[in-house]
Amino acid sequence: LWQSLIAFFCWGMASHAFGAVQDIRADREADIASIATVIGARATTRFAFVLYLAAGLLMATAGWPASAAAIAAVPYLAILLPFLSITDETCETANHGWRRFIWLNFFAGAIVTQLLIS
């Protein structure tokens, strides 16, 4: 159970962090602080990548059937790959990845929920 809870925490942090990347310039202009405005687009995206990876690895140790949910991290990692070298100047391009996340969340969420309640 603890693996699932920590994985969920990592997953949430990764999602919020990457979601903030696309707004770095606008948030800085509005004097809004976020992890992305503090450490920058590239570092935030890489941090999100590590958190998704950690979530997947934690779920892999959770025991069956929860361990099958580890595979759900793979598409998120794949979506982040093109953005690992993003800059603060190109931060708005992260919106393309974020939009993919929104659709993926419907499917991954449904699958993970079914695995965890079974």
Tell what function each PLM region has:
Residues 1-118:
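Multi-pass alpha-helical membrane architecture of UbiA-family
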